[in-house]
């Protein structure tokens, strides 16, 4: 901001109104999740990771607990018209798929830690 203040001869004051952090994906956690997806729904349903500049409140876990290995699961469930939209709808049977994937990744993480 200093350069803009000098360039335009103005004083710029900022205020951070919220604290949102970006995702920090751990490579080991991502590999465990990928294998859990393959084991649950098959390799044909595994998609490349999506890289997003967005923030999410769950990403604070990695900041507050740096030793925690984190990643994200994008569960294809036909969600529309958008997350948090008042008329959001999705295929509820995919929740069972999500539970299976997360159970497998947790069991694999426990086994790897032993």
Report the location of each language-model feature.
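Metal-dependent amide/peptide-bond hydrolase catalytic core
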Residues: 1-114
């Amino acid at each position: 901001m200093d350069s803009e203040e000098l360039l335009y001869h103005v004083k710029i004051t900022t205020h951070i109104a919220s604290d949102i952090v970006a995702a920090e994906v751990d490579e080991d956690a991502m590999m465990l999740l990928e294998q859990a997806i393959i084991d649950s729904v098959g390799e044909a349903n595994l998609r490349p990771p999506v890289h997003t500049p967005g923030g999410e409140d769950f990403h604070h876990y990695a900041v507050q607990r740096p030793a925690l290995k984190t990643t994200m699961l994008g569960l294809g469930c036909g969600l529309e018209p958008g997350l948090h939209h008042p008329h959001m709808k999705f295929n509820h049977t995919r929740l069972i798929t999500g539970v299976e994937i997360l159970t497998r990744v947790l069991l694999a993480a426990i086994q790897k830690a032993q």
